[in-house]
Structures are given as structure tokens and as C-alpha cells.
């Protein structure tokens, strides 16, 4: 019983101690909430310098125009030592920060401390406030507000256009596949390592909680690396090159093992993903919201109109081709006809010799059917397919001064067209040779 009483007394004492510790908090919150925070107004082009913790606010004084599509407004806080900068929406949030809050107190210790901070302000934000907390008393800092053209926004917009209109071609490109895989491997190597470890761990292992925390730690480290990229490149460039080389090779080997996409459905999914990313980049790169929506809609309609325009153009060409009168073919001259006949006849004779010399040709069967086997054999060996007597008869009948020409010139029915190929006896193989 005494032990229970002592245990109970111990519990009562701990509860009383906790009550005594928490009792001052409401009074502190009340005192802090009744005190209005001192706020310093920020103006474009004006630089202010202080050496103690202050609150600053910027209030929008003009409406954004169409010329501000790639305009940025940023607040730069530069200090001699490490400081902590917190961004809030208005003075009310600053007033809430002045109150005592265990969560805010804990999160303030987790906030990153920098000596050069950039805060980007939305063009449509009516008011933006920051709180600069000085850690060391001998710290001096300056706060400047600037507005101007941001080339990075323009670059993002062009990248969005490229991804949206050329997503199909990029999804089928091997160069894009390997370059994207290597880049993702370099940027997200820690995330990939955590993912691979999670596959090796059992699902009910206590390390799952550690891995879940590892994702957030990895993202935090990546943000920290990007913020200090210039210092890392100048001081630790040897380690950076080694890291990029090893991770790049591993990423390339991984991509080479699985190879580019070949399935049409996978390619379509990648194409749609690239197009959605392109539309998202186009939207976030334009600061004027209604102009951003208009550009996204125009790009989408232009991409979809591409196919109907092609169909209309093909239909127009077919209709035009049907309505157009066929142009009469150009007739050959006598010299062109003679040359074409010689070329085609020589080509046909060579094909016939090749066929007769092939193993598929039934030689004995053909010899049994022709009248002059020796003439056929001479023809296959390369001799002419016409005898001198046949050439002489052809020249006598169809040459200059021949009977055919006299009938054409002096015949009574010379105005009637006679369908006769005058060069045919010269080029065709006589039937008598087979």
C-alpha cells in the first residue's frame, strides 16, 4: 500500500510538474498575441540593412499585364553569417509566429540556415511577408526587392513546347531514352538506392519506418546539394566527376539491359506522359494565369487540329486529281522509238539466254520441238537471233525505197492509219529458230 501511495504520489508530482510547466504558456500566448509586430515595407529597387531580427512585407501596387508573362519578383536576403528566413502570407501570420507554439518552435530548429536566400513572389499575391531571424548578434544582412525578365521561365516554356509537339518522336528515340535514363539516374541515385533497399527488406521489418524516413532525408539532401552546387563544383570537383562517372555508367548499363521501349502501348503511355509534362511546364512558366491557360488550350487544339488538316488536304488532292483533265501522253519520235526498241529487245534476249542456260530449263524437251537445234545452240552461246538473209529481207521491205514505204507515200488509202509495228520483224525472235 505504501508503495502504491508513493507510486501514486510520484504520479501526482509528475502531473503537477507538467501542469506548472504548461500553465505559463496561455499567458505567454496572450501577451504575445496582444503585441502587434513591427513590419518594414519593401519597395522595388530599395535595399535595407539591419543587424537584428525584423519583419518585412511587400504589397502589390499594380496589376500584372500581358508583357509580364516571364517576369519574376524576388526578395533577396544576403547576410554576413547564417540566418533563418521564414515566408508567410500577411501580418496576421507574422503575429501568429510571435506567439509561443511548440510545433513552430520545433520546426524552427529544422529550418535551413543560409546566408543568401532568394524568395520568389507571385505576381498575383497581394501581400508577401518574411521574418528574418538573426542567430548571432554581430550579423548584418540586407533585404532587396527586384522585378525583371526571367530567362529560366522562357526556357521552361520552350521545353514544354518541345515535349508537347515532339513527344511522339522523343518517345521512339533511342538517344532520348538513354540520355533521360542517365540523367534520372544521376539526379535520383539516392532515391533509387532507397527503393532497391526497400525491395530487399521484408514488408514487416522494423526497417520500413527507417526507409520511409530515408525518402524524406534523400529529398532534403538533393535540395541541399542543388542549393550549394556552385561550392561543390569548385571545391569537390574530383569527387563530383567520380560520382557522375560511376552513377552514369550504372544508369547506362541499366538502360542498356532493358533496352528502349518496343511495345506500342508503352510508347503511347510515354508519349502522353511527355505531352502532359510539356503542358504543365508551359502553364507554370507563364506568370499570367489566363494567358497561361490560353496558351495551353491553343497548343492542345493545334496538336489535335493537325490530323483533320492532313485529312482535308489528302481529300482535296484526291478531288483535284479526279476533276483535272488527264494530260495527253507525249508521243515518241522515230529516233526515240528505234533506240527504245533496240534496248528492250537486247534486254529481253539476254533474259532469254539466261533462262535457257539455267538448270530449270528443259533442254531436251525444247530441242525435240524446234526445227534448227544448232541455231538455237548458237543463240544461247551468244550469236545473233537473226540470219543475214532475214536482215536483208527486212531492209528490202521496210528500209528506204522499200515496198512498205512506197505504199505509205503513194498508196490510194494513205490517209487511213494502219496498225502495224514496222520494227517488229527486226527485234523479235523468229519462230523458225525454235
Swiss-Prot record:
<feature type="region of interest" description="B; required for interaction with ran">
    <location>
        <begin position="326"/>
        <end position="395"/>
    </location>
</feature>
<keyword id="KW-0472">Membrane</keyword>
<keyword id="KW-0812">Transmembrane</keyword>
<feature type="transmembrane region" description="Helical">
    <location>
        <begin position="236"/>
        <end position="256"/>
    </location>
</feature>
<dbReference type="Pfam" id="PF10225">
    <property type="entry name" value="NEMP"/>
</dbReference>
<feature type="region of interest" description="BAF-binding site (BBS); essential for interaction with banf1-a, banf1-b and ran">
    <location>
        <begin position="368"/>
        <end position="375"/>
    </location>
</feature>
<keyword id="KW-0732">Signal</keyword>
<comment type="similarity">
    <text>Belongs to the NEMP family.</text>
</comment>
<feature type="short sequence motif" description="Nuclear localization signal">
    <location>
        <begin position="317"/>
        <end position="325"/>
    </location>
</feature>
<dbReference type="GO" id="GO:0005635">
    <property type="term" value="C:nuclear envelope"/>
</dbReference>
<feature type="transmembrane region" description="Helical">
    <location>
        <begin position="175"/>
        <end position="195"/>
    </location>
</feature>
<keyword id="KW-0217">Developmental protein</keyword>
<dbReference type="GO" id="GO:0005637">
    <property type="term" value="C:nuclear inner membrane"/>
</dbReference>
<keyword id="KW-0265">Erythrocyte maturation</keyword>
<comment type="function">
    <text>In concert with ran, required for proper eye development. May be involved in the expression of early eye marker genes. Contributes to nuclear envelope stiffness in germ cells. Required for fertility. Essential for normal erythropoiesis. Required for efficient nuclear envelope opening and enucleation during the late stages of erythroblast maturation.</text>
</comment>
<feature type="transmembrane region" description="Helical">
    <location>
        <begin position="206"/>
        <end position="226"/>
    </location>
</feature>
<feature type="transmembrane region" description="Helical">
    <location>
        <begin position="280"/>
        <end position="300"/>
    </location>
</feature>
<keyword id="KW-0539">Nucleus</keyword>
<feature type="signal peptide">
    <location>
        <begin position="1"/>
        <end position="34"/>
    </location>
</feature>
<feature type="transmembrane region" description="Helical">
    <location>
        <begin position="151"/>
        <end position="171"/>
    </location>
</feature>
<protein>
    <recommendedName>
        <fullName>Nuclear envelope integral membrane protein 1a</fullName>
    </recommendedName>
</protein>
<dbReference type="GO" id="GO:0001654">
    <property type="term" value="P:eye development"/>
</dbReference>
<dbReference type="InterPro" id="IPR019358">
    <property type="entry name" value="NEMP_fam"/>
</dbReference>
<keyword id="KW-1133">Transmembrane helix</keyword>
<dbReference type="GO" id="GO:0043249">
    <property type="term" value="P:erythrocyte maturation"/>
</dbReference>
<comment type="subunit">
    <text>Homooligomer. Interacts with banf1-a and banf1-b. Interacts with ran-gtp.</text>
</comment>
<feature type="region of interest" description="A; required for its colocalization with lamins at the nuclear envelope">
    <location>
        <begin position="176"/>
        <end position="287"/>
    </location>
</feature>
<dbReference type="GO" id="GO:0043131">
    <property type="term" value="P:erythrocyte enucleation"/>
</dbReference>
<feature type="region of interest" description="Interaction with banf1-a and banf1-b">
    <location>
        <begin position="326"/>
        <end position="434"/>
    </location>
</feature>
Amino acid at each position: 500500500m505504501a508503495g502504491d501511495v508513493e507510486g501514486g504520489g510520484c504520479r501526482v508530482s509528475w502531473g503537477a510538474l507538467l501542469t506548472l510547466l504548461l500553465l505559463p504558456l496561455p499567458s505567454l500566448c496572450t501577451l504575445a498575441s496582444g503585441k502587434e509586430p513591427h513590419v518594414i515595407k519593401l519597395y522595388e529597387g530599395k535595399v535595407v540593412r539591419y543587424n537584428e531580427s525584423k519583419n518585412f512585407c511587400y504589397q502589390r501596387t499594380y496589376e500584372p499585364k500581358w508583357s509580364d508573362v516571364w517576369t519574376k519578383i524576388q526578395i533577396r536576403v544576403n547576410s554576413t553569417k547564417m540566418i533563418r528566413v521564414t515566408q508567410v502570407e500577411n501580418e496576421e501570420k507574422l503575429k501568429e509566429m510571435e506567439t509561443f507554439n511548440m510545433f513552430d518552435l520545433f520546426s524552427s530548429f529544422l529550418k535551413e540556415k543560409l546566408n543568401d536566400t532568394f524568395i520568389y513572389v507571385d505576381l498575383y499575391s497581394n501581400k508577401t511577408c518574411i521574418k528574418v531571424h538573426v542567430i548571432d548578434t554581430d550579423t548584418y544582412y540586407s533585404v532587396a526587392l527586384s522585378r525583371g525578365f526571367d530567362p529560366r521561365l522562357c526556357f521552361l516554356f520552350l521545353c514544354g513546347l518541345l515535349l508537347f509537339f515532339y513527344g511522339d518522336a522523343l518517345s521512339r528515340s533511342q538517344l532520348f531514352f538513354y540520355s533521360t535514363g542517365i540523367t534520372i539516374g544521376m539526379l535520383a541515385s539516392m532515391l533509387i538506392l532507397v527503393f532497391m533497399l526497400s525491395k530487399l527488406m521484408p514488408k514487416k521489418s522494423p526497417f520500413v519506418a527507417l526507409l520511409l524516413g530515408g525518402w524524406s532525408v534523400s529529398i532534403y539532401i538533393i535540395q541541399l546539394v542543388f542549393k550549394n552546387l556552385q561550392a561543390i563544383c569548385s571545391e569537390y570537383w574530383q569527387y563530383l566527376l567520380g560520382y557522375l562517372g560511376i552513377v552514369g555508367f550504372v544508369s547506362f548499363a541499366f538502360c542498356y539491359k532493358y533496352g528502349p521501349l518496343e511495345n506500342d502501348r508503352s510508347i503511347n503511355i510515354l508519349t502522353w506522359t511527355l505531352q502532359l509534362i510539356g503542358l504543365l511546364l508551359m502553364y507554370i512558366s507563364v506568370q499570367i494565369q489566363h494567358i497561361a491557360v490560353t496558351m495551353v488550350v491553343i497548343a492542345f487544339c493545334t496538336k489535335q487540329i493537325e490530323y483533320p488538316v492532313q485529312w482535308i488536304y489528302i481529300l482535296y488532292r484526291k478531288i483535284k486529281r479526279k476533276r483535272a483533265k488527264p494530260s495527253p501522253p507525249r508521243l515518241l519520235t522515230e529516233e526515240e522509238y528505234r533506240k527504245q526498241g533496240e534496248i528492250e529487245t537486247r534486254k529481253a534476249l539476254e533474259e532469254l539466254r539466261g533462262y535457257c542456260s539455267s538448270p530449270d530449263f528443259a533442254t531436251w524437251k525444247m530441242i525435240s520441238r524446234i526445227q534448227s537445234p544448232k541455231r538455237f545452240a548458237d543463240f544461247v552461246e551468244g550469236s545473233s537471233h537473226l540470219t543475214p538473209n532475214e536482215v536483208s529481207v527486212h531492209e528490202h521491205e521496210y528500209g528506204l525505197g522499200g515496198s512498205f514505204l512506197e505504199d505509205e507515200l503513194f498508196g490510194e488509202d494513205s490517209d487511213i492509219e494502219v496498225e502495224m509495228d514496222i520494227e517488229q520483224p527486226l527485234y523479235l525472235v523468229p519462230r523458225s529458230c525454235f
